[in-house]
Amino acid sequence: MALGLLIAVPLLLQAAPPGAAHYEMLGTCRMICDPYSVAPAGGPAGAKAPPPGPSTAALEVMQDLSANPPPPFIQGPKGDPGRPGKPGPRGPPGEPGPPGPRGPPGEKGDSGRPGLPGLQLTTSAAGGVGVVSGGTGGGGDTEGEVTSALSAAFSGPKIAFYVGLKSPHEGYEVLKFDDVVTNLGNHYDPTTGKFSCQVRGIYFFTYHILMRGGDGTSMWADLCKNGQVRASAIAQDADQNYDYASNSVVLHLDSGDEVYVKLDGGKAHGGNNNKYSTFSGFLLYPD
């Protein structure tokens, strides 16, 4: 189309009479289609002649262009790929994956340190257990003292008892706990109700006595060492018939000392095999 216009414009200029018209340079279409013409000679003054139509040569050019349209555009080759874009924002974290397979076993560890030495024990003719004392060693450091204390605590003689009261008692008498559950070392005698020390050291004792009431009286229970009261407990009959008296002690005992529980008035309830009233103790560590 542009080629046709370039050919048609000069032809139109040649076909127009000299001085008959001038063209306003406002674009090729207006130059061809909208010329300004002056009034022809002999016409009324100031009259404007009608615009002349296209020339024969211009019409031939336009017909030739419509009969033979310009060739179609040819698509060029594909261009090179563009540059990579900028990275996008980070996406949200994904869901946790399934657990992986179990790994192989690790290597064998180093051997542990040697354990604490135990105490050498001997058995007497009566079946009791005694401790063989060694000679006095030299002064050790703090670590050696701790080791000796642990050795004595965990490797010393095992002494413990736990007994219950089957028969009821009242008045002022030693409670004979005749239901023996535990008696390591055989240091408790159920016929006397007394614990007899054979290994010097620190011991723990506790007792719980159920009062048999209903008559408005109270009950006292004392833990004694060699006849001396070391702990006391009281239970009162406050319109409920039954009440407990309990206490605990930590004592240092020498060989031959005796520990027991004695009533100091009132009534103690015997529980058959239910063990409502109990007495127990054990060796914390020997001297």
Swiss-Prot record:
Keywords tagged on the record: Collagen, Glycoprotein, Secreted, Signal
GO MF terms held by the record: identical protein binding
Any single Pfam family the record assigns to this protein: C1q
Reported impact of residue 33 to A: No effect on homotrimer formation, but loss of higher-order oligomeric complexes. Does not affect heterooligomerization with C1QL4
SMART domains for this protein: C1Q (SM00110)
Compositional bias segments (type: Gly residues): 127-141
Record bears the keyword RNA-binding: no
Occurrences of domain C1q (ranges): 154-287
Subcellular location: Secreted
Tissue: Highest expression in eye, followed by placenta and brain, intermediate expression in adipose tissue and lowest expression in lymph node and testis.
Record note on modification: Glycosylated, but not with N-linked glycans.
Signal peptide annotation: 1-21
An annotated GO cellular component: cerebellar climbing fiber to Purkinje cell synapse
Cystines in this chain: none
Domain Collagen-like intervals: 76-118
Chain positions covered by the region annotation Disordered: 65-144
Biased composition (Pro residues): 84-104
UniProt entry tagged with the keyword ATP-binding: no
Gene3D superfamilies: 2.60.120.40
GO BP, sorted A to Z: neurotransmitter receptor localization to postsynaptic specialization membrane; postsynaptic density assembly; regulation of synapse maturation
Summary of subunit composition and partner proteins: Forms homotrimers which can further assemble to form higher-order oligomeric complexes. Interacts with ADGRB3. May interact with ERFE. Forms heterooligomers with C1QL3 and C1QL4, when proteins are coexpressed; this interaction does not occur after secretion.
Chain's role: May regulate the number of excitatory synapses that are formed on hippocampus neurons. Has no effect on inhibitory synapses.
Name assigned to this protein: Complement C1q-like protein 2
Gene transcribed to yield this protein: C1ql2
